[in-house]
Amino acid sequence: MQFDYIIIGAGSAGNVLATRLTEDPNTSVLLLEAGGPDYRFDFRTQMPAALAFPLQGKRYNWAYETEPEPFMNNRRMECGRGKGLGGSSLINGMCYIRGNALDLDNWAQEPGLENWSYLDCLPYYRKAETRDVGENDYHGGDGPVSVTTSKPGVNPLFEAMIEAGVQAGYPRTDDLNGYQQEGFGPMDRTVTPQGRRASTARGYLDQAKSRPNLTIRTHAMTDHIIFDGKRAVGVEWLEGDSTIPTRATANKEVLLCAGAIASPQILQRSGVGNAELLAEFDIPLVHELPGVGENLQDHLEMYLQYECKEPVSLYPALQWWNQPKIGAEWLFGGTGVGASNHFEAGGFIRSREEFAWPNIQYHFLPVAINYNGSNAVKEHGFQCHVGSMRSPSRGHVRIKSRDPHQHPAILFNYMSHEQDWQEFRDAIRITREIMHQPALDQYRGREISPGVECQTDEQLDEFVRNHAETAFHPCGTCKMGYDEMSVVDGEGRVHGLEGLRVVDASIMPQIITGNLNATTIMIGEKIADMIRGQEALSRSTAGYFVANGMPVRAKK
């Protein structure tokens, strides 16, 4: 089998590349996905409110676990990643958050990455998006990804939580992806007008999969990339339960889009990475790149939970006897409780003046429950998900064997810096202050978690060690740049090799301020133009907010 391009991973970025490259009918593409199809009849992935379900099984989730995390009481922590057409966009929380403009400007400070500034990237965010209220300088109107805005009156707790943030002295913003990210406001989500999850399988692949020049193989577990000298010339993979490899050759390029956990594993199994690690497993060295699998970053978050005195939370939706009606409303009308992820309000703040742009993110949820659907509080309640955005802690992903089915050693080194502890203590104390504003007085009951007895630095630290969880935002393991630990250049091309790029969240040099999916899609759009040799979209001239030393919050 011969193709112009072979794409490994039909996830958030891989599906973008498959769709854009096959717009040229003379370009042939093979898209390999280790998971299965995105079954449209399966409510677990298609109903926004069911977002916890895919994380509980292994049909759509790789369900990785970390090594014991040394600063988290040696807990082995979840590291869920999407498996199937759509990748993690098939199982994520559907929060459409791009990050802060200064994240990208910060990337562009690196020599060679100058064209990754916010204004260079904004046209690609817009290209990918169709926002339900129409386009403007910041948002697109005819892209493959459906973005739904929060509407007034959905739940009084959303408005009350935003108002409480403002009463605590923080800014109000009407668009967390617009002129000003900093502040509290409504959150956009990747949901279609029909109330379905807007994964990249739905948005991108639906328009491309009927093209004769696109071949899609599911249940195809990539074993390794084939090299001729320093040039990537093909891919070998295992189909289904077969132990006999299948191979295809790429006339132009192999495009690795397997995500921040799998992309470094595939490079390592293919002989690209740290020479000592590869020697341990008798893998012939193709090219030494010590940064492969290093620089692993993530967002940690905690839940601060409160009893709700008014019967306005989503608690009744958790009762089995209410679920048939909710399911029918969603299935036949695309409306009701099932049609939202219920992350419809949130915010970004600076916890201290020393941060030039927000370092703490909030998601508000009008029910008290863990993100993966466990430990639901058996009463009306609400909660804040809160966590730091740009932790200095760094970890790694390393293969444990040559077997592609064996999970790697994953270590995030969560909370390994004093800055982490300071940010989380600040986050808990600031959140309590916000939760005690007048806007929430009629709703706020007792604090369920951490509980009012948890007050000292030592008590707060112990709560974080035992209860902080991943936000499922791993990135950085094949970082873009030109220093000795970088893996790819500013166009995603792997250093020292030919015909091989990495295009996914692993190439982010530093994690962004917010959820990763929108930016991963943007990376796919931007590099698709580079691969095709097309001129980049014209730089945006939109303005954006920079705090420039402004006070963190207004004086009362």
Curated annotation (Swiss-Prot):
Q: Could you say which protein family the record assigns here?
A: Belongs to the GMC oxidoreductase family.
Mind listing the GO molecular function terms for this protein? betaine-aldehyde dehydrogenase (NAD+) activity; choline dehydrogenase activity; flavin adenine dinucleotide binding
Annotated Gene Ontology cellular component terms: membrane
An example Pfam family from this entry, by short name, is GMC_oxred_C
Q: Which cofactor does it need?
A: FAD
Q: Which GO terms describe its biological process?
A: glycine betaine biosynthetic process from choline
List residues traversing the bilayer. none
Q: Which InterPro entries match?
A: BetA, FAD/NAD-bd_sf, GMC_OxRdtase, GMC_OxRdtase_N, GMC_OxRtase_C
User: Keyword NAD, does the record have it?
Assistant: yes
The species this protein was found in: Shigella flexneri serotype 5b (strain 8401)
User: What function is annotated for this protein?
Assistant: Involved in the biosynthesis of the osmoprotectant glycine betaine. Catalyzes the oxidation of choline to betaine aldehyde and betaine aldehyde to glycine betaine at the same rate.
> Is Heme set as a keyword in this record?
no
- Report what the protein is called: Oxygen-dependent choline dehydrogenase
Which enzyme class? oxidoreductase
For this protein, the record's PROSITE patterns field holds: GMC_OXRED_1, GMC_OXRED_2
